Design a protein with these regions (language model features):
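Walker A/P-loop NTP-binding motif
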Residues: 462-477, 494, 498
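Metal-dependent nuclease catalytic cores in nucleic-acid-processing enzymes
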Residues: 182-214, 332-336, 340, 584-588, ...
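Conserved helix-turn-beta segment of the N-terminal RecA-like "Helicase ATP-binding" lobe
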Residues: 490-522, 749-755
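Accessory interdomain/linker segments of ATP-dependent helicases and helicase-like nucleic-acid enzymes
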Residues: 1, 249-348, 696, 710-711, ...
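Conserved helicase motor core of SF1/SF2 NTP-dependent helicases
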Residues: 479-480, 486-490, 538, 552-555, ...
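Mg2+/Mn2+-dependent nuclease catalytic core
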Residues: 2-3, 7-10, 141-239
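Pre-ATPase regulatory/linker segments immediately N-terminal to the P-loop/RecA-like helicase/translocase core
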Residues: 54, 214-220, 228-246, 325-442, ...
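Metal-dependent nuclease catalytic cores that hydrolyze phosphodiester bonds in DNA/RNA
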Residues: 1-166
Length: 843
């Protein structure tokens, strides 16, 4: 026994080699404390049969569960929230609120029994009322906080508690299931880690915090339990956290193959006295999870190993490159907390929410899970808002890859390229849609497995191509169902706008906070009246012909595919989605065929990790780009379409991108009225030479050392030419920059000159401008040195001997009527493409 422990210790020491270890004042060792691990996921590893770090990995590989006990647990959380805020809260209102929040889960839960659920839920409510009354005879109810979050960089932990008070005197973790004795070890570990966070973040001792476990299945006398501190178990939990971090960093450094052989069920059995229980109940479930990993071909195993390694490398690379100054946008998860000094996540009770609306004046945050805020929170006057980090996207990618591994061999072989896609040439269009689109629409319809549609800037990929694809599918097969998805909330909003305009019936998945208010009535949670019937909602979901969602929502809530079959899935923005995040969805047996719409010549998905491992280079590609290359290498053209008619850029603006980036595609104007104009509609008299240049040239490069001043000067001049009556901040002018700090510099210069009329114009980075357009674009390159030039021109690739600069392509193709560029000419000319650009458009 001693020998075995000694060997384990040696193995652990080897695992920790090269990692940063922080030693706290009490001697507690924390490996890589900057890596934050969720408390609940650590606690979930503590089972009767052991607590092995591989259990953490296996839990990340398991498909998302959707069971009646989980639904009941979520309901209990909703009930606790409502009872805290209103002691007389109505049971029916609680049921409706929970149903609204989890409509998709209720509809797709296979073991759901409405009668039993209602009985169990009522018992939970009665017990919660008793517990709340008991707790708040001693504590101040107005100080109650529901689901406050914490980040502890001393321990490398993050998490959220079900209930506590703002004075930190009370901490309660709620469980809706069975106790199995006094309480489960996993639940004990969870509250011990929460207490550890309070101790190390706020220097609280055990006597100052009342820690309780609330088992709301039981009356208060049996279910509300005091929890005493157990330092030995707490340290064991931190040790497991260290092993988890070390294991995942090992995968990132040495590859998934370094642990793959250890992913066997018996590894998790550490307590032999529990072997009967383990082999009877636990082992079969683990085998079902892991079986696909061990039944892949050599090629598929190599693919999986590379992709999983890439995902873990990306997880840690994002940690190193995360920036709290990163610009927030609608749909982002954030922490917000009371500002009472310098911002510091670790020394505040955090609230978690989603950005609902954001502009220069205001940020509206939707509290997590529609929680009600307590009086103690609402009376605060000033808040700090910071991005909320999460491993959810990494876990979603892992589960997506596992879904691919468990897919049918035919689907796997198709996506791996060992099986050629099929075509049914007997298919014909139901009607003619548009001469520029009919050939592509026909070939897309004839594609039996997949079709790739390249949509360069301004070619109407959503407003025209996607609309026609939807109309053709439903007119030819009225009983068919479509799944439409995209990477960003904005793209999903654009899809919804197209469907509204074309009069289609559809549902949108996701939260109200992330949805444009124009389409909130299409959310599943809005699709029923005040007293919904599960059968009605399920029928609505089953019958609706179109479902729209972001790809991340489909990854994290894959339950839809268990009840609804789709003849066609169309993925917009497909060139911005890394392969692991989409391959599981597209290999599902619930989807017959798919169409990917994208443009590999625009900016791809952001990858944080360096491109220093040749084996992982292909992992940086989207599935769209990989399949596009695959089709070209196979010499097949029938499964690829290119939209060539663009209605955005005036031909003078399109000339340079056409020559340098779209040599094969050769984009042509539609032409729209503004594309036929011979001159710019600037009628005010020129006051100097620069005014005259701006009036005469559609594309113009202006050298500048102080770019912010020049940009604001040009903005003033263009505003005068456009005129107050015609100026529209959302359409007239936009400013594109390379770095975020340029935004602040330009805004400060505008404020200094008192240009309030220009406050509403969009000033943003190239990455954020992708998908947008303005009549006039001003592009401030912001390059001051060779490193900056390298950064500016880093997103390039070679195609047919030509260099395609994706970032420059996106910047140039946002403008409809005029494009103004500025920057350090001498430095920019050291790049071949910029050198030609400057020579061609300088005066």
């Amino acid at each position: 026994m001693l020998k075995k422990d000694y060997l384990c210790s040696m193995e652990e020491n080897k695992l920790f080699e090269g990692l940063k270890v922080s030693v706290l004042d009490d001697g507690l060792q924390v490996v890589e404390p900057d890596v934050l691990v969720d408390i609940s996921t650590i606690a979930a590893c503590f089972q009767d049969y052991g607590h092995h770090p591989l259990a953490y990995l296996i839990n990340r590989l398991k498909p998302s569960a959707n069971t009646s006990p989980i639904l009941l647990g979520n309901f209990a959380g909703t009930a606790l929230d409502q009872i805290i805020h209103d002691p007389e809260a109505d049971f029916g209102d609680m049921l409706r609120a929970s149903f609204s929040e989890q409509a998709l889960q209720f509809c797709t839960c296979e073991d759901f029994n409405p009668v039993k659920f209602k009985t169990d839920a009522l018992r939970q409510v009665n017990n919660i009322r008793q517990a709340v009354d008991a707790l708040f005879t001693e504590y101040d109810r107005n100080k109650a906080l529901l689901e406050p979050s914490f980040v502890c960089k001393a321990l490398g932990l993050r998490g959220r508690v079900d209930l506590m008070t703002s004075d930190m005197r009370l901490l309660v973790e709620q469980k809706s299931g069975k106790k199995w004795g006094s309480y489960r070890e996993a639940h004990f570990v969870q509250v011990l880690l929460y207490y550890g966070v309070l101790r190390y973040n706020f220097q609280l001792d055990t006597d100052s915090v009342d820690i309780r476990l609330l088992y709301s299945k039981y009356p208060v006398s049996e279910g509300l339990l005091d929890v005493a501190n157990n330092d030995a178990l707490f340290r064991e939990a931190i040790h497991l956290r260290n092993l988890i971090v070390a294991m995942e960093m090992k995968i990132a450094r040495k590859g998934f193959s370094s642990v793959l052989s250890q992913l066997q069920p018996d590894v998790l059995l550490q307590r032999q006295e529990k072997s009967d229980f383990f082999h009877r109940y636990v082992r079969p479930e683990i085998e079902r999870t892991l079986q696909p990993l061990h039944s892949l071909s050599t090629t598929e195993q190599d693919y999986l190993e590379r992709m999983v390694t890439f995902i873990f490398r990306e997880q840690f690379a994002q940690l190193l490159t995360q920036d709290t100054d990163e610009e927030l946008r609608r749909g982002d998860m954030v922490y917000y907390y009371h500002k009472d000094g310098d911002p510091d996540l670790c020394h505040h009770i955090l609230n978690k929410g989603m950005i609902e609306r954001i502009d220069d004046e205001e940020i509206a945050v939707w509290p997590n899970d529609n929680r009600q805020e307590t009086p103690d929170i609402l009376r605060k006057e000033s808040y700090v808002i910071e991005p909320a980090t999460s491993d959810a996207t990494t876990t979603a990618a892992l589960r997506s890859l596992m879904a691919f591994c468990g897919a049918s061999p035919q689907k796997r072989h198709l996506l791996m390229g060992s099986l050629a896609p099929r075509q049914d040439t007997s298919q014909r269009l139901s009607r003619s849609y548009h001469p520029a689109y009919d050939d592509i629409l026909l070939r897309a319809k004839q594609a039996h497995d997949y079709f790739l549609l390249q949509g360069p800037p301004g070619t109407g990929k959503t407003s025209m191509a996607l609309r026609f694809l939807v109309e053709e599918e439903l007119s030819s097969h009225p009983s068919h169902h479509l799944l439409l998805t995209a990477y960003t909330h904005r793209a999903v909003d654009e899809i919804c706008a197209m469907l509204e305009e074309s009069g289609q019936d559809y549902l949108r998945l996701g939260s109200e906070a992330a949805c444009d208010p124009r389409f909130a009535h299409r959310l599943l949670s809005s699709a029923f009246n005040e007293k919904p019937k599960l059968s009605d909602i399920r029928q609505r979901l089953e019958r609706v012909p179109i479902v729209v969602s972001t790809t991340l929502t489909l990854l994290t809530r894959p339950f839809l595919l268990s009840m609804k079959h789709f003849s066609l899935c169309i993925v917009d923005e497909a060139s911005q989605i890394l392969e692991p995040y989409i391959v599981g969805l597209l290999s599902s047996d619930s989807i017959d065929r798919f169409i990917l719409i994208g443009d590999h010549k625009q900016l791809p998905a952001v990858v944080a990790q360096p491109d220093d491992d040749p084996r992982l280079h292909s992992c940086r590609l989207s599935l769209f780009e990989r399949l596009l290359r695959q089709e070209r290498e196979a010499g097949r053209k029938e499964f690829v379409g290119i939209l060539q008619r663009q209605g955005r850029m005036h031909p003078d603006i399109a000339a340079f991108p056409n020559e340098f980036f779209y040599q094969q595609e050769q984009l042509q104007p539609v032409p729209c009225p503004h594309q036929l104009e011979t001159g710019l509609d600037y009628l005010e008299p020129s006051e100097d030479a620069l005014d005259e240049q701006l009036k005469q040239h559609r594309v113009l490069f202006l050298p500048a050392d102080d770019e912010a001043s020049l940009v604001v000067d040009v903005l003033q001049r263009l505003y005068r030419q456009i005129g107050h009556e015609r100026f529209d901040a959302a359409h007239s002018i936009g400013v594109i920059v390379t770095y975020r700090h340029q935004i602040a510099m330009i805004r400060r210069e505008m404020a200094r000159l008192g240009l309030s009329q220009l406050e509403e114009i969009s000033i943003d980075t190239v990455e954020r401008y992708q998908g947008s357009q303005r009549d006039v674009i001003i592009y401030s390159t912001g390059v001051q040195d060779h490193d900056g030039l390298d950064f500016l021109t880093a997103n390039c690739f070679q195609e047919d001997g030509h260099t395609i600069d994706r970032k420059l392509n996106v910047a140039l193709t946002r403008a409809r009527k005029q494009l103004i560029l500025t920057g350090n000419a001498a430095l920019l000319k050291q790049n071949k493409i910029f050198s030609v650009l400057i020579a061609r458009y300088s005066i």
